[in-house]
């Protein structure tokens, strides 16, 4: 498989405290990779540097040949980089459809009048379907997003992230705890959709504290502790890594979940 993201020697400091200490890894096209570690390990900082919300102190970030260190958030979106957050970031005062329309307007460079065209309304509904919101009635689609459940807002944010990319099947999806706060059935469905995104060609990097959503879903696992990448490999390799068990997973951890199929 083709390597599409190279992260080399990534460093970031906060007031003299090293948040990232020379982190290096590569991602291949169509991979679904989990980034795990305890709170404060540097996962969110790594995501912020990749997404352009922060500029790394040192190191290189190369996505499909483009230097992300020299790219703004807007440029990264055009290059196919999207991020979601642990707490869903949606415009609650706007309707569900308006949230999607706003993203489409920004990413497609079209006027608000053009957004009312049936083809773009159909595209908005397409992304809602991909995120698992196809069962929303017309009344709910035209209601404020604040009326959605927590899980509904997480799905809407995922739909917005996919809709904002030039080609979601070629994009880099940075998903910060996509299943956090969801009921077990919702969590399973969400992670199946995350896996499906990679199956369709997107490169997915996500964080999670729920180990079922990690070891039952990811193709590979990266382990970040105290700002350093201490292990990476298949779920089986990482679960068997003695340092990871001692410093994070615990000695009694075992792989008990069947892998999620896309």
Q: What residue ranges belong to the model's regions?
A:
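Glycine-rich phosphate-binding loops of nucleotide-dependent enzymes
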Residues: 2-6, 10-262
């Amino acid at each position: 498989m083709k390597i599409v993201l190279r992260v080399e020697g990534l460093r970031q400091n906060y007031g003299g405290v090293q948040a990232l200490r020379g982190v290096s890894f590569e991602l291949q096209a169509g991979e679904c990779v989990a980034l795990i570690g305890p709170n404060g390990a540097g996962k969110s900082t790594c995501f912020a540097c990749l997404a352009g919300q922060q500029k790394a102190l040192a190191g290189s970030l190369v996505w499909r040949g483009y230097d992300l260190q020299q790219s703004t958030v807007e440029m990264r979106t055009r290059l196919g980089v999207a991020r979601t957050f642990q707490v869903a970031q949606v415009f609650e005062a706007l309707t569900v459809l308006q949230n999607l329309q706003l993203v489409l307007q920004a990413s497609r460079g079209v006027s608000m009048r053009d957004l009312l065209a049936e083809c773009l309304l159909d595209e908005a509904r397409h992304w809602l379907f991909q995120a698992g919101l196809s069962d929303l009635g017309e009344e709910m689609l035209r209601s404020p997003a604040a009326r959605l459940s927590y899980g509904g807002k997480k799905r809407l944010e995922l739909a917005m992230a996919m809709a904002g990319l030039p080609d979601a099947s070629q994009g880099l999806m940075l998903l910060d705890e996509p299943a956090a706060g969801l009921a077990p059935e919702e969590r399973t469905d969400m992670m199946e959709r995350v896996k499906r995104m990679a199956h369709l060609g997107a490169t997915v990097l996500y964080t999670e504290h729920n180990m079922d959503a990690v070891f039952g879903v990811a193709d590979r696992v990266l382990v970040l502790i105290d700002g350093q990448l201490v292990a990476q490999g298949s779920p089986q390799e990482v679960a068997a890594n003695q340092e990871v068990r001692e410093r994070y997973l615990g000695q009694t951890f075992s792989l008990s979940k069947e892998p999620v199929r896309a």
